[in-house]
Amino acid sequence: MGEENQPNYTISQENWSLHRKGYDDQQRHQEKVQEAIKNNLPDLVTEESIVMSNGKDVVKIPIRSLDEYKIRYNYDKNKHVGQGNGDSKVGDVVARDGSGGQKQKGPGKGQGAGDAAGEDYYEAEVSILELEQAFFRELELPNLKRKEMDENRIEHVEFNDIRKTGLWGNIDKKRTMISAYKRNAMSGKASFHPIHQEDLKFRTWNEVLKPDSKAVVLAMMDTSGSMGIWEKYMARSFFFWMTRFLRTKYETVDIEFIAHHTEAKVVTEEEFFSKGESGGTICSSVYKKALELIDNKYSPDRYNIYPFHFSDGDNLTSDNARCVKLVEELMKKCNMFGYGEVNQYNRHSTLMSAYKNIKDDNFRYYILKQKADVFHAMKSFFREESGEKMA
């Protein structure tokens, strides 16, 4: 086919400066939204509307507007104060507030109506997905190791191939223009035009198998009578974000839910997050159940194991020594053990008093005193390691 019969493709050009204003405003808006998410993240993660949601809802957060200059009349321009009549002494009042002793004007705060303008802001809708991206960016399972690589592999899609045919949405513009330039240069006219069918280049993908390691997280929660509404809400808030984090970042992580009072039992995820119980507290029961699960179902040779236990620390005193012994036994089989204690009023905790004597780098604990501590507990338990990550 001669070159005159080749289908030609053109390169269009537009004065994008006409559209720049809207684009800049949109970019600035997005930057302010991301800044607001970052600043409000500790409080947002414990919003009841999020924790009790189906994961598809949106939340509203305040976005402060840009400060703008305002022109106002200076009502005090004719009010001046002089030195006096010459009889001034040390300590004499030589000037007073021009408002005549009246209360300073300002925006309303709390009770009573204010008489000055407040700070402008509006509420932006943010999806839970955006919160997750900001929250989970620096989190990872600690001490994750390779186990049974050959039996456990995941599929991953990568755009790593270039072909002459493909979807128009995947056209590689740079390679296409370079190909056209080279072909035109060989004919004596070095330019990007015309572009022929043979110059087109398309990016395409291949499915890549990557080795991955199995892991199991044992979510253990105290549901005894001493765990009040606030304590259970805090514990469930942590486990809500923990499960979303694990399922977002890892494809081969199992989660077992264990609830306990004086006895422990494996429950469904729905029961774990909704069912309430009462009774006394014997924390050793949940550690025995965790060890039983590991022995029967999750061998340390095949799984990375992470137990997390949340309680108010109000345990039967005679049971504390048994708890320490079982926790030490668990740590021999696990990558890390995490203990979270919900203790709003900083009261004496029999369980924490015993756990503070555990000297092991794989034992981590965090005391939650306010809602924002759910965020900080997640950062503490799942902080990025400084060492080399597992590929």
Swiss-Prot record:
UniProt feature, compositional bias: Basic and acidic residues: 21-31
Coiled-coil regions, chain positions: none
Record field: compositional bias (Polar residues): 1-16
Record field: compositional bias (Gly residues): 98-115
Residue ranges of the region described as Disordered: 1-31, 80-117
Pfam family, one: DUF444
NCBIfam families from the UniProt entry: spore_yhbH
Family from the record: Belongs to the UPF0229 family.
Name of the protein described by the UniProt record: UPF0229 protein BCB4264_A0587
